[in-house]
A protein has these predicted regions:
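Conserved substrate/cofactor phosphate-moiety recognition/catalytic segment
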Residues: 21-59
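Single conserved hydrophobic/aromatic residue that forms the stacking wall/gate
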Residues: 1-7, 12, 199
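Conserved nucleotide-binding/hydrolysis micro-motifs of P-loop NTPases
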Residues: 32-35, 80-82, 127-132, 177-180
């Protein structure tokens, strides 16, 4: 059973870990620590945006293929859909990715999408800009401290637009008021909802 958490990586990574641990699910995480482009990207988004997005798209497609061949329940903290519907268009709209690169990227994604099935459940964790900034400061990653507010705002707006048109099974969690880590009642409420929707 494939499950996907979507939303800002600052809001969903810990949630993915907790859900996987609680139910013995297999967790697939966004490849951040060994990403050869990430630090360069945050220092010069225009120069490295296409390289980074292709890197993520490649990793994500490999994950999709692997997950589709597994009989286990797998939860993933970033989806191939977000790359093409959120991040690449946001970079293009902000002038951080050229039209040539964006069209090339989109063509590649459309080909991959023709081979991809929707997950059994998509879980969108909605976080406000102030909440995202809190997460960034708590994580303390140097390269994230230079993130522009307009960049975060653009991502949030695109998430909302995409979620409105998403055709698969969807669950929305308020990331501002739901505390997975420190409030067991919040965690139980969300997990009960997930289990009722996926019928494990």
């Amino acid at each position: 059973i494939p499950l996907r958490l979507v939303g800002s990586e600052m809001c969903i990574r810990d949630s993915t870990k907790m859900l996987a641990k609680r139910y013995g699910w297999i967790a697939h995480f966004e490849p951040v620590d060994n990403n050869p482009y990430l630090e360069d990207y945050y220092n010069d988004m225009t120069r490295w945006s296409f390289n980074l997005q292709i890197y993520f798209l490649n990793k994500r497609f490999r994950d999709v293929v692997e997950i589709s061949q597994s009989k286990d329940t797998i939860i993933q903290d970033r989806t191939i859909f977000e790359d093409a519907r959120i991040f690449a268009p946001n970079l293009y709209d902000m002038g951080l990715m050229s039209e040539r690169d964006f069209n090339n990227y989109t063509d590649l994604f459309d080909l991959m999408l023709s081979l991809v099935k929707l997950p059994d459940l998509m879980i969108y964790i909605r976080c406000s800009i102030p909440r995202l900034i809190d997460h960034i400061q708590q994580r303390g990653r140097d390269y994230e401290q230079t993130m522009r507010i307009d960049y975060l705002r653009g991502l949030n707006e695109r998430y909302e637009e995409w979620i409105k048109t998403y055709k698969g099974h969807l669950m929305i969690v308020d990331g501002d008021t739901t505390d997975f880590q420190d409030n067991p009642q919040d965690f139980k409420r969300v997990t009960d909802m997930i289990l009722s929707l996926i019928h494990i």
